[in-house]
Amino acid sequence: MFDYLIKNGQLIDGTGSPARRADVGITDGKIAAIGDLSAAQAGTVIDAAGKTVTPGFIDIHRHADAALFRPHFGELELKQGLTTIVNGNCGLSITPCSGPYRGEIKAYLTPVTGELSADADCSSMQAYLDAARRQPSPIHTAMLAGSGTIRACAAGFSAPTLDAAQLRTVQSLIERELAAGALGVSLGLGYAPDCFYSTETLIEALRPLQDSGIPITVHMRQEGSGVVGALREMIAVARALRTPVEISHLKSIGKANWRSCTPEMLRLMAEARQEGVRIACDVYPYTAGSTQLVHVLPPETQQGGMEALTEHLADPAFRETLKARMLTGSDFENISLLAGFENIVVSSVRLDGLRQYEGQSIAQIAEQQGKDPFTCLFDLLQAAHCDVTMIDFIAAEDDICDILRDAHSCVISDSTYPTTGMLHPRVYGTYTTLLEHFVREKQVLSLEAAVHKVTGRPAAVMGLRTKGVLAQGMDADINIFDPAQIHTRATYQDPAQFSDGLDTVFVSGQPAILHGALTGRKDGTVLTR
């Protein structure tokens, strides 16, 4: 006697194997049996005839560190089939946020994570995870230890180099956060203060992970004209530490780099794997990204934190030097040069007096104001104390297709959760966009391959041994849907719209969505290493 019996569905098990007709029995939150269960009995029987049954989807790259404490958290995730997410990415985890630099850390993270609830203690990974366990959730959540936050906790944003004591503090904090349950360590080498690491010091800072098998995820030092060199750096890190490295949201920014850098990077990773280096990548299925607007500036400008940068922007000489560097610089991720100000859209500004600019490009705002785009950009950042996010149109869909086809890639969203303004549509629509656009419309992947990239593959990357595959004894996180009915409603103009098509979603063996409707159940857990 099962608790639930899913009958007559086409089962895609998450391994990449072909779909097959099979029934699934669920008992006590686990998959109790798979096969011909036509003679079995259950408390509830769900007829999945004409539908596909898959593992629940797993997003190993979100920034919902603070959002999980908000009302209605998990609903938009469930509506696109997500049952597990991993936060703390890009080196920007919300923990450890303590000590003399706590205010600077919070100010830096807020455009990405949004405001943190007073109920959440983010002083350490242990305190944060304890708070998360007290917060009922409809989906499973896990954390990475953010290297940038750890370095900022140890030395702030002003130190371009670390002394021996500070380096030991960083290593100690990494060990502490991992011991508390972080699944791995994330790097944000395109952000302060991680961007101040040399390759050699970075390897030393990460020495606690050597030979551990614990994953390192990385937003590379740049994704523009120097992206291939940035990848070579991470191959060197993976080789030195002998632990897995996952390149986050692989892309090549700027038309000058499209269709050349991405194939080369895929080749370099394949060659490294042949040599025994454990390195792979993930990708989001959109040509636009989203992050802090300060990311268009050279990374050294973030030294000292956001208030220091705000003060510097009041200096005309600083602005002139900055403009000259941005007009020609190729030694950093020069988004304004590579993509153009017309492709940099202000998506959220926390200061009410500036929110009229949300949804407009820097080029459009500059034209309205009668300013050149650099002056417009600097004025906006200064007035908003740098608390601005952007949506930047930077990548090529053909490059995305190449990465999707790579056998070692998985799909992520890189969703940020600012508490004001416009979200990127990927927050609501990444997983249905993959199935609707790249599987059904473009046929870049088979349905089985796509499901593997959002279930079995990400589970393996993060060491989630009981998730990602439909097999006896695995956790009963399960999606049921008709692939022909999957549809993404979220757009750049109207991003906060639930996706269609997820008929039933099980979390921990209980229905979080039943017949297309959210049930309100909160059976998610906090996952730890």
Model segments located where?
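C-terminal cap of metal-dependent C-N hydrolases
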Residues: 9, 315, 402-408, 413-414, ...
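Divalent metal-coordination and catalytic microenvironments
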Residues: 9, 29, 50, 61, ...
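Divalent metal-binding pocket/active-site signature
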Residues: 168, 176-234
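Metal-associated gating/positioning segment near the N- to mid-region
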Residues: 40, 48-115, 119
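Acidic, glycine-enriched loop/beta-strand segments at the rims
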Residues: 11-23, 388-394, 400, 442, ...
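Short acidic, glycine/serine/threonine-rich loops at helix termini
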Residues: 95-102, 152-158, 199, 228-232, ...
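Active-site neighborhoods of metal-dependent hydrolases
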Residues: 128, 132, 137-164, 170-191, ...
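Histidine-rich, glycine-flanked metal-binding segment
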Residues: 1-56
